[in-house]
């Protein structure tokens, strides 16, 4: 079947237009909230904390805070993107249109990842006003940002498909992802923890993402970079499989 570019473009641009209409909430809100972290932890508290692995504390926390934004925004953007058509009934028009399941997923996930990358880029630029950020491997940073954005946009699409109301959609970003980021070494090195808590932290998947991005920024990490990349690719493939299967079966969509 030939790829329906126009149908893909219509959904993608519709999602991007929604991003423009809610610019205050979609862009300014996460940028301002993250800036507060840079001010409090980077500029104020950072002046009283010793360097970690030869990196100033303010600079050290940049990858963790950036990862927090990437995860929450990619999940929220895409989950709401697919849930709204379910909520107002327009999802049936999309399913009835001459567009494949893959094209629907690519359009929503592509738009969600694009919005996340825009927010992430603005936050990265903003971070430079508060702390010194020197990137060691810029191409690896770009690769990881794109990989994380698309992977968790897919995860957000999956959440949107499985959710029956707005409350269910907010549970994972608020009660699961955010605590996992803060407990995953976003504001500290794992070597600062007692041995028991270091072992517990190894079971937190987000810690590998944060360390992967920190390695791309500064060349330091608590884990091998390939562990971070391979775990992310594996999670991406699982999300692709689940989304395509559930959407094709019409899970939580078709009556």
What are the residue ranges of the model-derived segments?
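Hydrophobic transmembrane alpha-helices and immediately adjacent juxtamembrane helices
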Residues: 1-138, 143-255
């Amino acid at each position: 079947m030939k790829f329906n570019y126009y149908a893909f473009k219509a959904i993608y641009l519709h999602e991007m237009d929604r991003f423009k209409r809610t610019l205050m909430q979609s862009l300014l809100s996460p940028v301002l909230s993250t800036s507060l972290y840079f001010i409090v932890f980077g500029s104020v508290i950072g002046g009283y904390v010793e360097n970690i692995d030869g990196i100033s504390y303010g600079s050290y926390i940049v990858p963790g805070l950036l990862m927090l934004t990437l995860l929450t925004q990619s999940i929220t953007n895409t989950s709401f993107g697919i849930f709204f058509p379910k909520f107002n009934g327009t999802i049936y028009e999309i399913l009835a249109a001459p567009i494949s399941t893959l094209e629907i997923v690519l359009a929503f996930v592509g738009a969600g990842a694009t919005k996340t990358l825009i927010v992430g880029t603005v936050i990265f630029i903003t971070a430079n006003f508060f702390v010194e950020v020197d990137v060691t491997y810029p191409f690896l940073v770009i690769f990881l940002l794109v990989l994380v954005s698309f992977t968790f946009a897919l995860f957000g699409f999956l959440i949107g498909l499985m959710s029956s109301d707005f409350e269910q959609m907010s549970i994972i970003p608020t009660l699961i992802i955010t605590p996992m980021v803060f407990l995953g070494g976003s504001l500290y090195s794992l070597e600062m923890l007692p041995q028991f808590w270091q072992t517990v932290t190894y079971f937190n998947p987000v810690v590998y993402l944060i360390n992967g991005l920190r390695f791309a920024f500064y060349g330091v990490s608590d884990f091998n970079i390939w562990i971070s990349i391979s775990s992310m690719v594996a999670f991406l493939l699982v999300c692709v499989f689940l989304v395509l299967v559930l959407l094709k079966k019409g899970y939580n969509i078709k009556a």
